[in-house]
Amino acid sequence: MKNFSLLTTIEGLRRLAPAYDLICTRLPIPTDQDLALPIGGKKNNLTRRSWLNFAGYCKIPERAAVRLLNEQIATTESSVDLIYASFLPDKLKAQYEAIVRQNTAILSA
């Protein structure tokens, strides 16, 4: 792991943060790759099947991987709501929404 963050609970327990360093680099750098590290040898144009194959490689049962992908897809509208509640300029909000919807369509196919 290169970038990670720890959270400390009230009880003093430490655990990995569920998300860290999340930023849409497509807004400032439209030609940026989808991923920094390859999944199945690819950094771009990953499909739902690409992610399911990677889950299999990681020994995650396909049923669980499908459930996780579907849960991600189900967060689309709340993700878009967060975008529009942000301090981004309106033009960038619309571009960010388009990226989220494009990625959702890919995961849904």
Predicted regions and their residues:
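Anionic ligand-binding catalytic core segments
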Residues: 1-109
